[in-house]
Amino acid sequence: MATALSEEELDNEDYYSLLNVRREASCEELKAAYRRLCMLYHPDKHRDPELKSQAERLFNLVHQAYEVLSDPQTRAIYDIYGKRGLEMEGWEVVERRRTPAEIREEFERLQREREERRLQQRTNPKGTISVGIDATDLFDRYEEEYEDVSGSGFPQIEINKMHISQSIEAPLTASDTAILSGSLSTQNGNGGGSINFALRRVTSAKGWGELEFGAGDLQGPLFGLKLFRNLTPRCFVTTHCALQFSSRGIRPGLTTVLARNLDKNTVGYLQWRWGVQSAMNTSIVRDTKTSHFTVALQLGIPHSFALISYQHKFQDDDQTRVKGSLKAGFFGTVVEYGAERKISRHSVLGAAVSIGVPQGVSLKIKLNRASQTYFFPIHLTDQLLPSAVFYATAGPLVLYFALHRLVIRPYLRAQKEKELEKQRESTATDILQKKQEAEAAVRLMQESVRRIIEAEESRMGLIIVNAWYGKFVNDKSKKSEKVKVIDVTVPLQCLVKDSKLILTEASKAGLPGFYDPCVGEEKNLKVLYQFRGVLHQVMALDSEALRIPKQSHRIDTDG
């Protein structure tokens, strides 16, 4: 799978990788790495004018890396924000004797100023479209009623309700935000709408408050107040009180929620609601990397119920989740099960089957696209019919796998190739420059590598036979893909010292003599080496630390 290409992937030199030192490297380690590279790239060591020019440029790059990492202040900036952090406006006013913590605070201040200038550009739109479909004629059809009716051979599927809501946010200051929202609903030919305006203020790091004003054609004006407060680091409370004006008078309402973190993954909620539908609700929610579990109990008028639900999260690229729940109360019993899966970078598709008494059988399809939600509840039957349950379960699965194989997967593959091609075109000049720099570095290494090989051969030490870096294609179905690996035998041999080769946890593309042959794609380093006269082989991930020789890399030739 292709990795995301950041803006800094080409522009930001990895100074640690260039010097081949750990991010926690001491001053002595930095100095030793700097001296070794200076001996390799010093312009005075090369007489050929072309090599001398290339050596001078590489020497300056190594010197720049050492200057940044050897200074505690610039190193702190680089560690936190990269090379772009060093170039950010405003650092000229920072005192030279600041600590890393003070530097972080200064950078965050500069970032806040930049964010404030972009406040007006953020609206954070959110929307929901719900379309209720009545498909009961598919399963609850009485044939005798339609025998004498012309054109009644096809079941009637109707849209019986719709709901549309939308909201936007407009940041006024760093602590004040205006929120405008509206909704329209219709059911069986009757409908209405409302519009709301809210003003939210963050009062402190522990809380915020929100004033709400609303009006609609079916209900009168609405005035509300919402408060949030962190009582302790593990406990918070929210309160929402509202006054709804109507022809029948004023209807007050109050909702209070008290929540507490019971442990790292578990939160307990206690809710009290007073007004039109008074109730007391308590629930426990446990959310981990692989599961989500909820148990709830509500006592209220007119609804009282108990709920238990479980969701399993698969650790795959598509973020697949399966879920099931049981809800029982005065209104009846409902069993629901379903699944959801990521179908693109910003889209999640889900489906659930609801089986209840007296509700019947329903199929619910939901698509989340960024901050927009599209919801389609399809009512199949008022009765508990096995055929309805079967088709509600099997139908979406068959349809999804057919669409995924015939439409979604080819589309995503084409989009991925298009993005990669666009990246290659936009970075072609930079890649060519990096390639030329790497080739120049390899030419400058030749004499040093020759001496290293002679020394290693004399003691039966570490000899790099072959080394390749880039994207390896192992799947036979992808053999037609263009080879995207480069030979890095010489650069790796140049890093051998005392029959050892140690590479740190960083992208190998930043090492001297290396470059990225396939920007935006996953890369590996494959090394075939000889130690004590025995062949060894290892394959390492791009950012994986590597230490050779190792006994586990030995190639078994006994068979």
Curated annotation (Swiss-Prot):
J domain mapped to chain residues: 14-82
InterPro entries xrefs: DnaJ-like_C11_C, DnaJ_domain, DnaJ_domain_CS, DNAJC11-like_beta-barrel, J_dom_sf, Mito_inner_membrane_organizer
Keyword Transport included in the entry's annotation: no
GO biological process: cristae formation
SMART domains with a match to the protein in the record: DnaJ
PROSITE patterns documented for this protein: DNAJ_1, DNAJ_2
Pfam families: DnaJ (PF00226), DnaJ-like_C11_C (PF11875), DNAJC11_beta-barrel (PF22774)
Superkingdom of source: Eukaryota
Compartmental location: Mitochondrion; Mitochondrion outer membrane
Entry protein name: DnaJ homolog subfamily C member 11
Organism field: Bos taurus (Bovine)
Gene from which the chain derives: DNAJC11
